[in-house]
Amino acid sequence: MKLFNKILCAVEFDESSPAVVHFAREIAKEYGATLCLLHVTPLPLNATEFSPIPMDPYPVWEKTARAELEKLAAAHLEGRGVTYKIETRSAEAADGILGQAQDMDADLIVLATHGRRGVSHFLIGSVAERVIRRSPRPVLVVRPREVAPGSN
């Protein structure tokens, strides 16, 4: 029995994305696991049940997120011996990550931390911290500077 069969890799489309994908890819290769690239977009303000504004069933954000995930996969996964899929969700970030992990029965969650401290951490909080505290699954948190420049 393999330790990891399904790995969830949550990305934000920022400078941390290549590092997170790198770590997730290498673990997936080592264990022959399937990798799921996920981007969670915050719910739009008009998504509440009290809104009189109808929601597009396939909103622009999802198309944009999928296109960005496909670019990330092309740059860091294709031709690297890893089976992967792409998913998007619209939710609060930690909720979206945990929901996807549960839905796919992920064996591992990989995500980045930005190392916020002080007032910024107090006001914004940490998605990584919320995922770690609430997840029944192992979570690997990557600091972007942990991957040497040029290693993809």
What are the residue ranges of the model-derived segments?
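Structural beta-alpha unit
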Residues: 1-2, 74-109, 146-152
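Small/aliphatic-rich secondary-structure junction motif
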Residues: 2-53, 147
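Short, well-ordered secondary-structure micro-motifs
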Residues: 20, 47-50, 98-99, 122-123, ...
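General small-molecule cofactor/ligand-binding pocket signal
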Residues: 38, 85-89, 140
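Short, hinge-like loop/turn segments at secondary-structure boundaries
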Residues: 52-56, 103-104, 127-128
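A short acidic, glycine-rich active-site loop
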Residues: 54-67
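Glycine-rich, Arg-bearing micro-motifs that act as flexible, cationic patches
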Residues: 108-130, 148-149
